[in-house]
Amino acid sequence: MKVAVIILSILVLAAASESIEEYREDFSRPNAMERSANDWIPTAPSAVERSADFAVEELERATCAGQDKPCKETCDCCGERGECVCALSYEGKYRCICRQGYVWIAWYKLASCKK
């Protein structure tokens, strides 16, 4: 019984340390903790998933200089029930992104949409 408790404790510690490491990687960019929720835009999961996705590439290329109007004219959020708005990315550039309320629609949701 004691051996089972020890093994279970080791597994829990291993899982916790992995979660901590992932958290550190997420915030390893400079000034990541200083940014507000509205300034942070998630990136695509991988280059392979993005390579053929016109919708994602279109949104990444679209610059809007802080104005929502160009975004509303050029993107449709790939059928998601959201709105296309202009937001400051972690790169310090304004980009068109899709959001539902205060939640950014993740890039992987846009990956299935091709215009």
From Swiss-Prot:
It is found in: Secreted. Disulfide bonds join C64-C78, C71-C84, C75-C113, C77-C98, C86-C96. Residues 18-61, 115 form a propeptide. The keyword Disulfide bond applies. Keywords: Disulfide bond, Ion channel impairing toxin, Knottin, Neurotoxin, Secreted, Signal, Toxin, Voltage-gated sodium channel impairing toxin. Residues 1-17 form the signal peptide. One of its GO terms (molecular function) is toxin activity. Belongs to the neurotoxin 03 (Tx2) family. 04 subfamily. The presence of a 'disulfide through disulfide knot' structurally defines this protein as a knottin. Blocks voltage-gated sodium channels (Nav). This is U2-ctenitoxin-Pn1b.
